[in-house]
């Protein structure tokens, strides 16, 4: 009953079957506090045969669009490659693409919705695969107004697996994740 009543108010629930009590897999970005959030996406090991990479799930405030992009930095923090910013209000196709960072490739796909039919919240999902552990994958989020929640979850290619991995702050001005907003 509690979940039904909160859902009716537009609350989004993200459930995980994994043990996320010590994983800083969530971020809260408040556009009134910061222009653009930057964070490092930490990856689980690729020791699972079904491992694709990470799934970044982002939910915003109803009526407030947001945009996000990913970057590839080398171990020194130098930008190697990046996607454009994708905006929830204008992305109307599924993006399936590759970033080239020297001899490495980073696979990614993006889908978005300006207003989910169930809760009117803007939504974006970015799936990213990067096997070069020396490189850093960076998520950037920007909005003019509102709040955006983000979760960093494992993505397996068999459709299951949703335990969390950390968001990290490797440099000044970056934001680390927290263990909140998981059930």
Residue spans for each PLM region:
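Loop-rich non-cytosolic ectodomains and luminal regions
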Residues: 1-183
